[in-house]
Every structure is written in structure tokens, then in C-alpha cells.
């Protein structure tokens, strides 16, 4: 009876040891798979980020072109600012024509 208990104890002990070793290997494999998934996810996010930047750039260009065509429709010769209305040749040319007195 004592030898039966010892052999049963030995079998159970070896079974638990082998089971714990298998569980450790599974955890390591899952850890490696998670790391690989994280790396793939990072690469995918970098690609998405690049595509988003490209999309933003294209949308920005398209909006500028839309604004430009709208400005041409309402102002075919360009907008005239207040300065251009009162100084059609620009302030610089006026300063050249009339040099300041006293300097």
C-alpha cells in the first residue's frame, strides 16, 4: 500500500511538472504571437498615418482650387484691397516720386 501511494504520488508529481512546463511554453508562444501582432499593428498604423497625411494634403489642394475658381467667378481681375484703391501704383512708387522733405 505504501509503495502504491509513493508511485501514485510520483506519477501525479511528474504529471503536474510536465503540465506546468507545457503551460509556460504556451504562454511564451502567446507572448511571441502578441509581439508579432503588435509589430504588424504598428506597421499598419504607420501605413494608415501615411495615407491620412496624403488624404489631408489632397483635400487641402482641392479646397484651394475650389476657392480660387470661386474668386475668379466673382472677381475676374483679382481682389482689390483698400490700399490698391487709394494707391493704385503702390506706396513705394509714390515715395520715389515725392521724396520726404527734411531728410
Swiss-Prot record:
Region (Disordered) residue spans: 24-50, 67-103
Biased composition (Acidic residues): 31-41
Modified residues (Leucine amide): 65
Localization (cell): Secreted
Residues of the signal peptide: 1-22
Record-annotated membrane-spanning stretches: none
Keywords, alphabetical: Amidation, Amphibian defense peptide, Antibiotic, Antimicrobial, Secreted, Signal
Keyword Chaperone carried by entry: no
Protein's UniProt name: Preprofallaxidin-6
Amino acid at each position: 500500500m505504501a509503495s502504491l501511494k509513493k508511485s501514485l504520488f510520483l506519477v501525479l508529481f511528474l504529471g503536474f511538472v510536465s503540465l506546468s512546463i507545457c503551460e509556460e511554453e504556451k504562454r511564451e508562444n502567446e507572448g511571441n504571437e502578441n509581439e508579432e501582432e503588435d509589430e504588424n499593428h504598428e506597421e499598419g498604423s504607420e501605413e494608415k498615418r501615411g495615407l491620412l497625411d496624403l488624404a489631408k494634403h489632397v483635400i487641402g489642394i482641392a479646397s484651394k482650387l475650389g476657392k480660387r475658381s470661386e474668386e475668379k467667378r466673382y472677381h475676374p481681375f483679382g481682389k482689390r484691397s483698400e490700399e490698391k484703391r487709394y494707391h493704385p501704383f503702390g506706396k513705394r512708387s509714390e515715395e520715389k516720386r515725392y521724396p520726404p522733405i527734411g531728410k
